[in-house]
Amino acid sequence: MDLKDEFIQIIKKYSELSLKESENETKKYIQEVFNVSLSEVFIKEPSKQETLKQEPTQETNGCIYIFKKGKNIGQKCGSGKSKFCYKHKKNDLNIKVNQERNIKKPIPKPIPTNKIETGSVINQNWFIGTSIGKGGFGEIYSAAKFNDHGNYKDDDFSFAIKIEPKSNGPLFVEMHFYKRVIVEKEIEKFKLQKNIQYLGLPKYYGSGLYNDYRYIVMEKYDSNIDKLFRNGDLNSSTILQIGIQILNIVEYIHSKGYIHADIKGENILLKENDTSHIYLVDFGLCSRYSNIYQPDPKKAHNGTLKYTSRDSHQGVESRRGDLEILGYNMIEWSGGILPWQHLCKKSAGKKILNEVSESKIKYMNDLSLFFNKVQFNDTNLKNKLQTYFETIIKITFEELPPYQLLHNIFN
């Protein structure tokens, strides 16, 4: 896909949102999509005298110029061959981008050990407690909230604060996902429509910048499904119960136009090992859903390799892909060994990535072979999961998944 086609696809996905937001929010949307810093994004209202031959006043390589309600703006503008504008007819939104935006930026450095110390105070709101988890770039701490009098309760570290370098993209994406999707009013409306009492999405308490770091604050949990699995604490009934809850969550996320793309045991949290109320977290790989199937090599193989969907291996995020990822997890929780599992190493190169992708394609094209290869202790659970996979592999890319039918299979 050349730059123009990619550009048009992205603008079609984002233009409706962009015009509903303030200028700063529009900049953030574009920053998220094109992976540039906010200083590289400019929004201006072109005057009636502006023509295609005139350059915007800002002259910076790798910039994106956004024109709202512009006139005389065509699909190519400026003197540079790699520069062009695209006008989205529905919302009259015009954006200009330089091909030089594809210059690779340095990978942000992880937070050094003990850089954020216990006892630190973030923006006069949050008191940092002990570290409760560490990832590739950031760290998660317990936290207490200051009240209006500047005090906090010593025994109330019921919050979790996730901190990463502010140049790291996933936490930026996650922060905006929380703001746009985890909205209590919308969640309550969905629960009412679906006649369910509970939807496993974490409570969001705020986010912001702290020195050279970005942070997000959410509810703190006690454990995750991966730990229960490794301890042998997942039986067939519990696995099906978790599957039903995840189906509810992804249906809601999909209804808001997003794909999760990284469902796995480590990202499914719970309190006091209560599997009747699980919470799906980590939205750093979330992306907006597009009904155009357009593989993107830059996004190919995103996610956790063992569970990545066939679409994700091609650089396309899809609703059916989330369901496929869930199915792979449920097989593993059931004690099954995925046929490509031995290939999934932390430092997998391109050859291994392609081998895993090809293995999934092979087995999804022959489910009988797949389920003969995977070992199950529970025949009833195996039959349910086989029916589940037989259903989801028939879903076309653009098709809305039959969530209720999948519920019925697990019930």
Swiss-Prot record:
InterPro entries membership: CK1_Ser-Thr_kinase, Kinase-like_dom_sf, Prot_kinase_dom, Protein_kinase_ATP_BS, Ser/Thr_kinase_AS
Organism: Invertebrate iridescent virus 6
Keywords: ATP-binding, Kinase, Nucleotide-binding, Serine/threonine-protein kinase, Transferase
A GO molecular function held by the record: ATP binding
Alphabetized SUPFAM superfamilies for the sequence: Protein kinase-like (PK-like)
Protein residues bound to ATP: 132-140, 162
Family according to the record: Belongs to the protein kinase superfamily. Ser/Thr protein kinase family.
Gene3D superfamilies, sorted: Transferase(Phosphotransferase) domain 1 (1.10.510.10)
Annotated protein name in UniProt: Probable serine/threonine-protein kinase 389L
Domain Protein kinase: 126-410
Pfam family for this entry, one: Pkinase
Reaction(s) catalysed (UniProt annotation): L-seryl-[protein] + ATP = O-phospho-L-seryl-[protein] + ADP + H(+); L-threonyl-[protein] + ATP = O-phospho-L-threonyl-[protein] + ADP + H(+)
